[in-house]
Amino acid sequence: MNPFLNTAFKAARRAGQMMIRAAGNLDAVKTDSKAFNDFVSDVDRNSEIILVEALKEAYPHHKITCEESGSHGKAAAEYEWIIDPLDGTTNFLHGHPQYAISMALLHKGVLQEALVYAPERNDVYMASRGKGALLNDRRIRVSNRIELNRCLIGTGFPVVDQSMMDKYLVILKDFLAKTAGGRREGAASLDLCAVATGRFDGFFEFNLKPWDIAAGALIVQEAGGIVTDMSGEDGWLESGDIVAANPKVLAQMLKIISAHV
């Protein structure tokens, strides 16, 4: 584990321990609504404080971009962390174990390091550019399925911005007719990690934020998968529209999506 990932893991583990304690008494967790179907809790905020303080102490010249508190540090910094202190807040607030901490490091705008930590399962997904992806120190690879009708596809509903909902449901219906099934588990970082481990053969979602997908996308890429936007291009981090899959399935997924967008 390199120094960047070591720092990220230690911070994520501390934040995760706080989450586990909070999950034992959810009635005491204070929650606000940022928008329709978009919640933030004091657990999100406390996790972010732990992560930001650890990164600032270790790397005072790095920029840090967070879901809740925005940007910290110099805008022109060569290194930038993108972090989601609690991906899957709604799951967490309902006692569902599918939530995670997501941390990615960019150097001059290029993703270099990624860590996704799932506290309930104590699962640690990591990747370094050019060095592969790991789950709990074991190398992971995307699936090798070819036939779309045998594939399990992950997705996420556009519940915050519902302007895409009608179009999305048409796309989802098409996928359900042509695959072995679809799953909506409520935490994009873990959905992407499921692609990286082969539990999902592919994943697609619209209108996500950089902190939702930056870390998980690099983990997919380093596990042998491909990540694109809905047009098959590389603009997914900017647009928030993302498709991730094993190389044999990606084109088939893009064909379904392109028929409706």
From Swiss-Prot:
Stored PROSITE patterns: IMP_1, IMP_2
Q: Could you tell me one molecular function GO term of this UniProt entry? A: metal ion binding
Arranged from A to Z, the UniProt key words for this protein are: Chaperone, Cytoplasm, Hydrolase, Magnesium, Metal-binding, Ribosome biogenesis, RNA-binding, Transcription, Transcription antitermination, Transcription regulation
Q: Where does substrate bind?
A: E67, L86, D87, G88, T89, R183, D212
- Identify which top EC class this enzyme belongs to: hydrolase
* Record-listed Mg(2+) binding positions: E67, D84, L86
The record, for InterPro entries, names:
IMPase, Inositol_monoP_metal-BS, Inositol_monophosphatase-like, Inositol_monophosphatase_CS, Inositol_monophosphatase_SuhB
Principal cellular location given in the protein's record = cytoplasm
State the compartments where it is located: Cytoplasm
The GO cellular component terms are: cytoplasm
Reactions it catalyzes: a myo-inositol phosphate + H2O = myo-inositol + phosphate
A GO BP term here is: phosphatidylinositol phosphate biosynthetic process
Cofactor(s) listed: Mg(2+)
Query: Which Pfam families does its entry note?
Result: Inositol_P
| Enzyme Commission code | 3.1.3.25
Family membership noted in the UniProt record: Belongs to the inositol monophosphatase superfamily.
PANTHER family linked: INOSITOL MONOPHOSPHATASE, INOSITOL-1-MONOPHOSPHATASE-RELATED
The subunit field of the Swiss-Prot or TrEMBL record says: Homodimer. The rRNA transcription and antitermination complex (rrnTAC) consists of RNA polymerase (RNAP), NusA, NusB, NusE (rpsJ), NusG, SubB, ribosomal protein S4, DNA and precursor rRNA; S4 is more flexible than other subunits.
Function as written in the Swiss-Prot or TrEMBL entry: Might be part of the processive rRNA transcription and antitermination complex (rrnTAC). The complex forms an RNA-chaperone ring around the RNA exit tunnel of RNA polymerase (RNAP). It supports rapid transcription and antitermination of rRNA operons, cotranscriptional rRNA folding, and annealing of distal rRNA regions to allow correct ribosome biogenesis. This subunit may play a central role in organizing the structure.
Protein name, please? Answer: Putative Nus factor SuhB
Organism field: Neisseria meningitidis serogroup A / serotype 4A (strain DSM 15465 / Z2491)
